[in-house]
Amino acid sequence: MFRGKVRHIHFIGIGGSGMNGIAQVLLNQGFTVTGSDLKESQTVINLKNMGAKIYIGHDPKNVDGADVVVYSSAVKQDNPELLRAKQLGIPTIPRGEMLAELMRFKYGIAIAGSHGKTTTTSMVGTILGKTGYDPTVVIGGKLEAYGSNAKLGSGDFIVTEADESDGSFLKLTPTIVSINNIDLEHIGFYKNLNDIKRAFIDFANKVPFYGAVAVNIDDQNIKDIIPEIEKKIIRFGISEDSDIRGYDLRLENGRYRFKVNDFGEIYLSIPGKHNVYNALAAISISVELGVPFCVIKEALENFKNANRRFEIKYDGSVTVIDDYAHHPTEIKATLSATREMFDGRRIIAVFQPHRYSRTFSLYDHFVRSFNIPDITVITEIFPAGESPIDSVNGEKLSSDIKKETGKTVLYGEDLQKTFNILKNILKKDDVLLILGAGNVTRLSDQISQFLKNKEGALR
């Protein structure tokens, strides 16, 4: 990895989920890390406590003295810090390129796919941690075992998410990769689904001749690209042509018990059939690395997922679950897992749409994603820096979901109004699911505190 001339690294948007993990690893390696973000957050506070100097707001002078400037895909090219760095001749690189630097002299394991990257990366990191390999792990959410979303290990392995959203995963140099699924997403960057498939083909073929590509054989879009993958392929899934096969799936107390090849049985610690596939991806990689099944089994049966991945925030008279799901496929999978785990209880889902472009391009899919909840509350769209699109908004989406489902669907507008709605409709034994990638997570904390104060008073 680079040394010598590069000592001071500045991050624009350092509080982002893809950025702060890299910053943590570099801090732990002794680099001087500075950064900027639009607002203070717990992530920013944690980085400050680790020794990073962080500015709130973007100002050209923030980059002074930096040897390299790292920016996220959310940073626009007219950002004043980015412009200043270019004016001064300071190298500016996307986060994917810095992540590639961390991987360059390690045995890289990269988890790719439209959904499930954080969970699968966390699973692989947990399994390898049980072996004594002591991997470096960089994920998109805070993992309880690490107390953060990154861990600097002393071993030869680095396990990381491979983010396809801006094509930056093509900068990585992994030895083993997993492709969990391919879905229509990030239409602002990719032209169409075929364009997305092409990117995953190119990503898979970056693996060296001695590496391997684990693929979900049950995903049709992945099946379509397999003939163009030129490297060793490990097929995982529940179909009979899988190399690593999960079978005899049984639902017990809302979680899945299943067998794997002739290795043995696993009772997964987290709910949802989609997590069976995430586990099979992690198992495929671990078996390829020679990890004994008994170690894999112990790790997955005691696995604690990253924050906002079906995170139970409160479990009293009402159960409150906070989840990052923001794509129709993720929403349906999370709602299905909720129904399996809490069968017979009333489910109330709150969804904050994320980005106008995503809501517009996947609108009909969103409309058809809320058949499971008894009550759905839709907030206004979280813009994530985008300009509004006239034809889509939260109120219209809520109305169209109501027409599609024939169930109670309410428009919450902002978080405060949504909170007021929830205070009036929540009853004892309800399950409240908070969904979205924006700031809706604040609502899970707010309503959890309200319920603690009201414990015993709900009817």
UniProtKB/Swiss-Prot annotation:
The main enzyme category here is ligase
Where does this protein hold ATP?
Answer: 113-119
Question: Which catalytic reaction applies to this protein?
Answer: UDP-N-acetyl-alpha-D-muramate + L-alanine + ATP = UDP-N-acetyl-alpha-D-muramoyl-L-alanine + ADP + phosphate + H(+)
Record's GO cellular component terms:
cytoplasm
Role, per record: Cell wall formation.
Read off the Pfam families from this record: Mur_ligase, Mur_ligase_C, Mur_ligase_M
NCBIfam families found in the cross-reference section: murC
What is the protein name for this chain? UDP-N-acetylmuramate--L-alanine ligase
Question: Which pathway does the UniProt entry assign to this protein?
Answer: Cell wall biogenesis; peptidoglycan biosynthesis
What's the encoding gene here? Answer: murC
User: What is an annotated GO biological process for this record, any one?
Assistant: cell wall organization
Q: Which InterPro entries match?
A: Mur-like_cat_sf, Mur_ligase_C, Mur_ligase_C_dom_sf, Mur_ligase_cen, Mur_ligase_N, MurCDEF_pg_biosynth, UDP-N-AcMur_Ala_ligase_MurC
GO terms assigned for molecular function: ATP binding; UDP-N-acetylmuramate-L-alanine ligase activity
What EC number(s) does this enzyme carry?
6.3.2.8
Q: Which cysteines are joined by disulfide bonds?
A: none
Localization terms from the record:
Cytoplasm
Can you tell me which family this protein belongs to? Belongs to the MurCDEF family.
Q: Which UniProt keywords apply?
A: ATP-binding, Cell cycle, Cell division, Cell shape, Cell wall biogenesis/degradation, Cytoplasm, Ligase, Nucleotide-binding, Peptidoglycan synthesis
